[in-house]
Amino acid sequence: LIQYVANQTLDQDLARIAVAHCRTTRDCLVRPDGSTAHEGIFDTQSGQFLRQSTHQGLRADSVWARGLAWSLYGYSKMYALTDAVEFLHVSERNAEYWLHHLPADRVPYWDFHADLALPPPQGAQKESSAAAIAASGLLDLAGQTRLPDRAAAYRDTAIAMLDALVTPEYLALDTPGWEGILKHGVYHTAKGLGVDESVMWGEFFFVEALLKAVQQEEREGE
C-alpha cells in the first residue's frame, strides 16, 4: 500500500520507506528455505533485530500458513509496483515452499508444522483464507516469473486450490445458516477467535483469485 501511494503521488520518501520495509522483512522473517516467520522482535532503542516470534502461528520457528501466503502475495505485488527483481525472487522462494508442502487437497492446514495427529483447532485445522490469498498471488506470479516451467506450476497449483475451494467442503453455498462464502477459515488459533469460520479477507481474496482465473481463461480464448 505504501509503495502504491508512493507511485501515485511520486513521493520518494514513501517509496524509500516501502522498499526498506520489504527488505527488512525479507532479511529478518523470510528463511533460506522460503518459509516465513510470523513476526520479528526488534530492540526499540537500537532497532536491532532480536528474534523471530509469533502470536497466530504454532511456534516462533514454525510456518504459519496465512503468513506465508501474505509474503508470497505481497512480494509479488511489490515486484509489480517497483520492477525490482529482488522482490520477485522472494515471492518465488515463498511459492516453492508453498508448492512442496501442501496436503493432497491443496488447501493448507493453519500451520505447516501443525501436528495432524491432533484434532482441530491445534492440529488438523484447515485454513481456507490462506489458500485464497496464495491462489491469487500465484496467479500473478505465474505471469511474472522468467521461468516457464515454474509459471505452469504456479498457475496449476492456484487453479487446483480454487477447484478445492469451490467444492461443498469449503464453499458455503449449500450450508444452511452459514453467514459467509468460504468455510474453514482461521483468524487466531491460540486465542480461539474466528477458528473454522468465514473470515473477510478469505472472502476478498477468494473472489479476487476467481476473477483473475476467469479473466485469464478469457484472454487465452481470444
Give the predicted meaning of each segment.
Residues 1-222:
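Glycan-recognition and catalytic cores of secretory/periplasmic carbohydrate-active enzymes
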